[in-house]
């Protein structure tokens, strides 16, 4: 006994050294060395390297691992990041232009923004285990509908600029006059919005006319107009008569509106607008140097089937109870592909949830009080400036004034900087001041000092200041639903948030094995700095000398991503994978234009591609030509050669995913690239499956010219229940000059090409997560993570292949990081469909794998490297038990109609009801596996009726009793 203890103590002493103990790879990667050996043995392999040799073609393997800094540790990386963060300077930013500081209620920050129960969930395709955030998003839609005065709203877009661009495209797609090609944009719109709209218009052949809305001569050549409300200089304008002029020539009117201003001002709907767009940033979201923030999009009911983005609707479940779901999905890219209303996939769910909760917490009166207080402070400031001889350009305002400072401008701006205050500088010498929720009397006194205004008794003036003219004042009510009236104490709010959280399955519950989605660990250390004020309180248009910390992060991350991808340049601006695709295709388009080859407009896309691929290609102005796949799931080389040769004079690009969407490393990928290059085309690689490449191969090694990366997949940014995402693009050297730029900032790319996102660096505050992940893993850790992701997928494929045929494998019989299981035979043998298997998995405590993509009637599984062998086995056991249930249906032990699969998922209410009319016991419904009793996740609703929901579309809040 003593000898054993002595040996153990000696082993411990030998194991511990001066090296830090808080290394990260062992925390991130799920299986330990013993589990790895066990899985390898089940595959008949002796090492991870042998697995990689068999799964990954030798011709594309990297000769050496990426040259990255040595892996840091969790404690040290936060120390290092604090030092970097200290190089950002937190000024009071009154720049405005669509970005305003706000006060984030602690109950929302702590319990949603910083809560993995909210931020690790996936897009709510599986409605039954997503009812919490679906309700929060329904609240968001109701909030937008009420404030804009329109009839229907989506559940968020990426930002205000892209929302405006989407509005332009909607107007263009539904125009009745086919020759109408002009879109009017008011010169009073925010500059970044104009920039994004112009970028979107160019590939589509739309002519943007920027000018004064009062003097522009509209005619039938115009299909739409875009207006800012209040204007970028702060002026409040009643656009009613102009909108009528637009309608008279058949043009669709869009108003980009400030949500907080709409609590006091006449709504866009009251002015006759067809569409309202904007940002919900000032409803509880940090500035974050530009994002992420939730854009919004509202329109008239008649345009609902042309609307972009996710739409939450009310349906009913199998028990007749209300059930929320994603509605009208036939509009979207994953179904309509190049005919979709938008290429948007990931939106900004987490941010929309936060904004909706901000409105729930404050209620209509609270929001109105916030807006009124801001307006009163603005009025006091304006009056004081006018009394001191300054001219205010805008005679009407909500929170923003623009001052004619003349020769005093330079001194004023210098004094502002000395007070650590940012003001908006116009090229014509004017100065803008946009006040916000954080402003108090002391801030106003500091502004008086900056403008050398005589100090005024602010408290005395406050009560009588700020009367908005009746002609602009809002007369209609808003946020009348009880959800906005009921949760105004922290106790109530906390319990409401927790109630909704408990209805959603996230990574805090179990593995989410969605193929092509990479639901890996979002480590706590990676998430910490997102809410640090040094990163969160920075305005996106703050002077560069105040953002040196961000610059360090961007430069290092871009360098690391170049090393990982084998590319020469990276842009971090795209704030979603879909935007990355679009930006990458625009780079290809601009490259061809620079070579005087504007006729190159054909984009070849395999039939197995993600739906965003053809949607993005169409948006970039390309003609989509589909390439077939062979029986092994690979790109059909003969068909590719035929199509490439047929279109060689007009070939712009090929879009491919690697490993393929069929879950295999295609052996011929380099030949595929060569076929396209030899005919003048460029190769775009969809980076959705990059988690199987890092450290083993790279897009550059394979021969791609451009690739987007999903930082919310491969590089650990959480999915947020449907966003935020970040989709930077890497490009080869010849495409670097064609990366996106930005009208307001000297971008790192040094070019003048238009922006694809409203903020220069997109969702800047969350790229920190990926920076930390790479720094903690190092090259060796990242490469090992890739190996384990491939091991885990092959282990699952091996365990399940006898019950569910694995549809595609590589040359040596192995899959990549995901596998596709064929469920189609069970439809014929037992009338069991893929949806039945997916819903039954909920009863076992799992989110379903990806359903019916890329092959209908199949399940695509991606376990990632973060899941341990215990969790993989638990999932496999659930799938095998479901297979046994299918066999029980086949042999008659279970009824073909009334069985646990057809009736799944089973709620607690169903299984505790006194009435049970089914032909199988309650216990089998409720506790189908041993672990169910230890930790049971109960779906809040039974199976939701998709058809009923689309036929009876309701997209605003549920009745009162639902909130009791």
Curated annotation (Swiss-Prot):
InterPro entries: GcvP, GDC-P_C, GDC-P_N, GDC_P, PyrdxlP-dep_Trfase, PyrdxlP-dep_Trfase_major, PyrdxlP-dep_Trfase_small. The modification N6-(pyridoxal phosphate)lysine is found at residue 713. Its EC number is 1.4.4.2. Keywords: Oxidoreductase, Pyridoxal phosphate. Transmembrane segments: none annotated. Residues 1-10 have a biased composition (Polar residues). Its cofactor is pyridoxal 5'-phosphate. GO terms for cellular component: cytosol; glycine cleavage complex. Residues 1-25 are annotated as: Disordered. It catalyses: N(6)-[(R)-lipoyl]-L-lysyl-[glycine-cleavage complex H protein] + glycine + H(+) = N(6)-[(R)-S(8)-aminomethyldihydrolipoyl]-L-lysyl-[glycine-cleavage complex H protein] + CO2. One of its GO terms (biological process) is glycine decarboxylation via glycine cleavage system. It is an enzyme of class 1 (oxidoreductase). GO terms for molecular function: glycine binding; glycine dehydrogenase (decarboxylating) activity; pyridoxal phosphate binding. Pfam families: GcvP2_C, GDC-P. CDD domains: GDC-P. Coiled coil: none annotated. The glycine cleavage system catalyzes the degradation of glycine. The P protein binds the alpha-amino group of glycine through its pyridoxal phosphate cofactor; CO(2) is released and the remaining methylamine moiety is then transferred to the lipoamide cofactor of the H protein. Belongs to the GcvP family. The glycine cleavage system is composed of four proteins: P, T, L and H. This is Glycine dehydrogenase (decarboxylating). It comes from Leptospira borgpetersenii serovar Hardjo-bovis (strain JB197). The gene is gcvP.
């Amino acid at each position: 006994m003593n000898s054993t203890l002595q040996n153990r103590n000696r082993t411990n002493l030998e194991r511990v050294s001066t090296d830090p103990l808080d290394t990260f790879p062992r925390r991130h990667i799920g299986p330990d060395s013993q589990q790895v050996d066990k899985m390898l043995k089940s595959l008949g392999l002796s090492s991870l390297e042998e697995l990689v040799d068999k799964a990954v073609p030798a011709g594309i393997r990297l000769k050496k691992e990426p040259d990255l800094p040595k892996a840091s540790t969790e404690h040290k990386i936060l120390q290092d990041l604090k030092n970097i963060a200290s190089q950002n300077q937190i000024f009071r930013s009154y720049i405005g232009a669509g970005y305003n500081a706000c006060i984030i209620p602690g109950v929302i920050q702590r319990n949603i923004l910083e809560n993995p129960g909210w931020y690790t969930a996936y897009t709510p395709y599986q409605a039954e285990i997503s009812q919490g955030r679906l309700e929060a998003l329904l609240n968001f839609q109701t909030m937008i509908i009420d404030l804009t005065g329109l009839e229907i709203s989506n559940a968020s877009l990426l930002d205000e600029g892209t929302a405006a661009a989407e509005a332009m495209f909607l107007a263009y797609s539904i125009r009745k006059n086919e020759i109408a090609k002009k879109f009017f944009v008011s010169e009073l719109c925010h500059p970044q919005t104009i920039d994004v709209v112009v970028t979107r218009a160019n590939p589509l052949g739309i002519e943007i006319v920027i000018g004064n809305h009062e003097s522009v001569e509209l005619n039938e050549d115009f299909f739409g107009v875009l207006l800012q409300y209040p204007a970028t200089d702060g002026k409040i304008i009643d656009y009613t008569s102009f909108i009528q002029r637009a309608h008279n020539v058949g043009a669709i009117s869009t108003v980009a509106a400030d949500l907080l201003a709409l609590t006091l001002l006449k709504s866009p709907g009251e002015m006759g607008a067809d569409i309202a767009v904007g940002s919900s940033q000032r409803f509880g979201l940090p500035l974050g140097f530009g994002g992420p923030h939730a854009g919004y999009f509202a329109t008239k009911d008649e345009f609902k089937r042309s609307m972009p983005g996710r739409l939450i609707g009310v349906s009913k479940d199998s028990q007749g109870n209300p059930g929320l779901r994603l509605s009208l999905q036939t509009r979207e890219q994953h179904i309509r592909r190049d005919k979709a209303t938008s290429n948007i996939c990931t939106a900004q769910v987490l941010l929309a949830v936060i904004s909706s909760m901000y409105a729930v917490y404050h209620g209509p009166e609270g929001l109105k009080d916030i807006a009124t207080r801001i307006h009163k402070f603005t009025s006091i400031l304006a009056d004081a400036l006018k009394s001191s001889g300054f001219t205010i350009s805008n005679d009407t305002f909500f929170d923003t004034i623009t001052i004619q400072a003349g020769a005093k401008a330079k001194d004023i701006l210098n004094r502002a900087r000395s007070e650590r205050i940012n003001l908006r500088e116009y090229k014509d010498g004017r100065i803008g001041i946009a006040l916000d929720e954080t402003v108090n009397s002391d801030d106003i006194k500091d502004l008086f000092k900056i403008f050398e205004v005589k100090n005024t008794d602010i408290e005395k003036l406050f009560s009588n200041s700020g009367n908005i003219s009746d002609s602009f004042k809002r007369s209609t009510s808003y946020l009348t639903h009880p959800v906005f009236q009921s949760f105004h104490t922290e106790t109530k709010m906390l319990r409401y948030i927790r109630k909704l959280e408990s209805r959603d399955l996230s990574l805090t519950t179990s593995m989410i094995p969605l193929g092509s989605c990479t639901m890996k660990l979002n480590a706590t250390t990676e998430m910490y700095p997102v809410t640090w004020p040094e990163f969160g309180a920075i305005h996106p248009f703050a002077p560069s000398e105040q953002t040196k910390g961000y610059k360090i992060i961007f430069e290092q991350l871009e360098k690391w991503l170049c090393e990982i991808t084998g590319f020469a340049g990276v842009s971090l601006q795209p704030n979603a994978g879909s935007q990355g695709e679009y930006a990458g295709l625009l780079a290809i388009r601009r490259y061809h234009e620079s070579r005087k080859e504007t006729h190159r407009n054909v984009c070849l896309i395999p039939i197995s591609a993600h739906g965003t691929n053809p949607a993005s290609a169409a948006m970039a102005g390309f003609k989509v030509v589909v390439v077939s796949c062979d029986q092994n799931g690979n790109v059909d080389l003969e068909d590719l050669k035929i199509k490439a040769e047929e279109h060689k004079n007009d070939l712009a690009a090929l879009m491919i995913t690697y490993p393929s969407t069929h879950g295999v490393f295609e052996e011929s990928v380099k030949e595929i690239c060569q076929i396209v290059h030899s005919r003048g085309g460029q190769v775009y690689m969809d980076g959705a499956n990059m988690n199987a490449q890092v450290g083993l191969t790279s897009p550059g090694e394979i021969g791609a010219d451009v690739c987007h990366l999903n930082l919310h997949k491969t590089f650990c940014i959480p999915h947020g229940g449907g966003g935020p995402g970040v989709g930077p693009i890497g490009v080869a050297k010849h495409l670097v000059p064609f990366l996106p730029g930005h009208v307001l900032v000297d971008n790192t790319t040094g070019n003048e090409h238009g922006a694809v996102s409203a903020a220069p660096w997109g969702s800047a505050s969350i790229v920190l997560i990926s920076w930390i992940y790479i720094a903690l893993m190092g090259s060796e850790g990242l490469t090992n993570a890739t190996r384990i992701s491939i091991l885990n997928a092959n282990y699952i494929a091996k365990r399940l292949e006898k019950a569910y045929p694995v549809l595609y494998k590589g040359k040596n019989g192995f899959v990549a990081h995901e596998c596709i299981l064929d469920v189609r035979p069970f439809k014929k043998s037992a009338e069991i469909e893929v949806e039945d298997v997916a819903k039954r998995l909920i009863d076992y405590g799992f989110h379903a794998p990806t359903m019916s993509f890329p092959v209908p009637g199949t399940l695509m599984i991606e376990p990632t490297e973060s899941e341990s062998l215990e969790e993989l086995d638990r999932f496999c056991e659930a799938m095998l038990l479901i297979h046994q249930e299918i066999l029980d249906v086949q042999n008659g032990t279970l009824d073909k109609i009334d069985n646990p699969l057809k009736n799944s998922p089973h709620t607690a209410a169903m299984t505790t009801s006194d009435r049970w009319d089914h032909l199988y016991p309650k216990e089998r419904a409720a506790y189908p596996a041993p672990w169910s009793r230890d930790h049971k996740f109960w779906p809040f609703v039974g199976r939701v009726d998709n058809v009923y929901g689309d036929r009876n579309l309701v997209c605003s809040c549920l009745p009162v009793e639902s909130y009791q």
